[in-house]
Amino acid sequence: MSTTRFSSGSSSSLSTAPSEEPVEAGVLEVVAELVTELHGASAPAAVTLDQSLERDLGIGSLERVELLLRLEQAFGVRLADEAMMAAERPRDLARALAAARPAAPERPPAPRAPLTPGIAAPVAAATLVEVLRWHAERDPGRTHVFLRAEDGTERAISYGALWARALAVADGLRERKIGAGDTVALMLRTEEPFLAVFFGTLLAGAIPVPLYPPFRADRIEEYVRRQLGILGNSQARVLVTFAQAERVAAFLRRHAPALAEVIPADRLARPATRRPAPRLAATAPALIQYTSGSTGDPKGVLLSHANLLANIRAIGEAIDIGPDDVAVSWLPLYHDMGLIGAWLGALYFGIPIAIMSPLAFLARPARWLWALHAHRATLSPAPNFAFDLCVRKIGDDELVGLDLGAWRLALNGSEPVSAETIERFTRRFAPYGFRPEAMCPTYGLAEASVGLTVSPIGRRPRVDGRVVSCGRPLPGHAVRVVDTAGRPVAERVEGGIEFRGPSVTRGYFRNPAATRAAFRDGWCDSGDLGYWAEGDLFVTGRRKDLIIKAGRNLYPQELEELVGDVPGIRKGCVAAFGVADPAIGTERLVVVAESREASPAAREGLRARVLERVVTALGVPPDTIVVCGPGTVLKTPSGKVRRSATREAYLAGRLERRRSARRQWARLLVRDVVAELRRLPDRATALAYGAWVAGFLTVAGPILWILVLLAPDGRATDRIVRRWCRAVLALAGCRLRVEGLEHLPARGAAVFAANHSSYLDTPVLLAALPADFRFVAKRELLTTPLIGTIIRKVGYLTVERFDVARGIADAERVTRALTGGASLLFFPEGTFLRAPGLLPFRLGAFKAAVEAGCPVIPVTIRGTRRILPAYARIPRPGPITVTVGAPLVPAGREWREMVRLRDLVRAEIARTSGEGCVENRATAS
């Protein structure tokens, strides 16, 4: 492996830990240089191989991409896609570089010679097994799948080869007594073993249950928790995995009672016998697809062979799939769009499909387009963010010679479709042969197998205002829009979307309650809102109340067990629950934990250890941690924690008062009577003020809720919320002063960047700023009862902080909003602490501003931390000042410009607020 020579006169001011390995030393130097550039004088004194890129060095997802690109340039190698996504420490990067191949430009692949036209689809087949056997018997040597590697090389899999491998897998499963009605979990990547194991499971008469594979070591506990929920619901008897995931799979086996065996896919197959394939009924289960965003009670969509074939055939009829079509997909096979919409659809119609890893696309989006070019592909589905990613992340130099002229349908679905994305993608790639009518917005969901509506072929996307048409129902399917009573509404009247047809699930696996809730008179409730216009369905948003925090599920019992393992906390004496914050309507995660420690210092140390433990395991910090004495957590006579009762006691203020009173009575009553008496007036005033605030919020909160629910979406709801915030602050005695309003732009989009020090910051900004702006909030706020409703109705944007692919899509959506003229407000710190100090700023806001060419306006909030600091329940009156700074205009579109703007804004806010900068984010992560 050839590497560049690292100069001893590096511009980095950080020292690097001694290393005997040149690769490790080089990695440390590149990392140190980037960290110095990001954090300047506040950077850590040294970079070591085992520091966390994110927690210790402040290198988030955006910064990581920049770091990895620099490493590739410095070492002259090409890093593997998986290594790029999974690296958590400099040592991981060094190992990946040591194993990397020398860099070579990814040469555009030469177009493949077209295959001979396929044969007609098996219209008489009743099951997926019959479909594969039909093709394997009639044309066993014909290529079914081209598996593309990172370097663009491909390996062909024929129908006959897939059938033979599936038979061998089926024999391996039968040897393990797996048969009809059993479930088999597939924790496999988008690779060849998935194909054979999926059909081998069906050939054994069992039901495949796809699970997404682990790929982030620092998220493994959360991953295990989610998969255990699915394994428990599905009652899978065998888990088929790959070598790198065996350790995780073994852990799952120990904690999933029904799971009898974990086996790597390469050790599952047995020499195929002549045993005939089972005769399966069309109504037999063919797949359990667990919906993304499942709650603590996972919902597995049970689909039969008849459901899947009906959906595939209806899609084929709607988009006129024929023997001359060729497909390309980078979608994961464990997701319904990649599994059913891409692979199984291509299988049924006998058309070749090129399949590549999702990581290959995310790392270098141009690979998708070059795969289309190489195969002269006509069909390729993808979520909306993929099209936007291509526009944003592919350079012109990567497109030389590209030809997309054969691409007749770009099926855009699986998430809301953006008119701006469609327009930009079409304009950008028109010179390369992409036609406007090739963009085909669709709508579907797991409960309908995958597809439900599709735009007519040959028609340009239809846009109504800013909403993109999702087309018309698939043949044989019906869709209606209804009011809350289930009555169909008129055209252009928004309502709930319901559907029925042969593709629709029979219900949720082992979850009759969820099944009953989803169906009404034969119609399945999608949980979405939309309207009809000129025969087209326009989907406007979600209605389902998905209980998700930061893209993951939080289970109280498991969180309590996690906290109970902290030394000094009484095991079994922990309560975790969520409470609504009446000040801003959001929900806070509260942990109440008993300890025998009595001193305030010891309890503060326990709080810090609990915070560290939860953040390390879950990636989401509790908003409030209460460490209290024995007997505080309420329980039933049998010893079960009464979370609701403990929550009520917490909300009523009985927990801290009870603890505080006992401590003061036992330790201070005799010695500090005089001091206690001197504090009584202040305490009485605080309690009286707290009671006053709680009283009017008890009245004002429900009023706001009702007004928000009744108000139209958009500006009307925004005005109501702003007026409510002004009224509440006035009633609370919080005098609000605003400075610098002359700096607000008269027109055009802008990025507002504000410091974050209290839960009051959001209502304060809504009350103070007359500018028309939209907040950019963390996605987990959508799960809270009131704030989630406000976010959706006003049109605030949300971003995913933990899921890489979704986070990229959200970031692109933010930039699109700015480009479209919307002003956005960010809290670049992302969180706040009780102690004063400006936390490190994340780059997201400044990246969006640079890409959109919008000015950044610093906004400083003073006073809210004193009025309602972190962990406080009772506010106190006081003045609040909001200062709007002068706009800062981006001077370019480079990486350094993002860093420059971030540093200038942070320095200005630090100066105006009077608070120093805090450079260690770990305590707030």
Question: Which residue stretches match the model-derived regions?
Answer:
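Conserved AMP-binding/adenylation subdomain of ANL enzymes
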Residues: 309-326, 336-378, 393-398, 478
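Conserved AMP-binding/adenylate-forming core of the ANL superfamily
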Residues: 145-196, 216-223, 279, 300-306
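AMP-binding/adenylate-forming catalytic core of the ANL superfamily
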Residues: 373, 380, 501, 506-507, ...
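AMP-binding/adenylate-forming catalytic domain of the ANL superfamily
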Residues: 78-97, 584, 615-640, 654-665
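Conserved AMP-binding/adenylate-forming
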Residues: 408-410, 417-537, 543-546
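AMP-dependent adenylate-forming
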Residues: 131-157, 285-288, 295, 444, ...
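Non-catalytic C-terminal accessory region of glycerolipid acyltransferases
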Residues: 1, 651, 680-684, 808-925
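Conserved pre-ATP/AMP-binding loop-to-beta segment of ANL
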Residues: 140-143, 270-290, 296-297, 302, ...
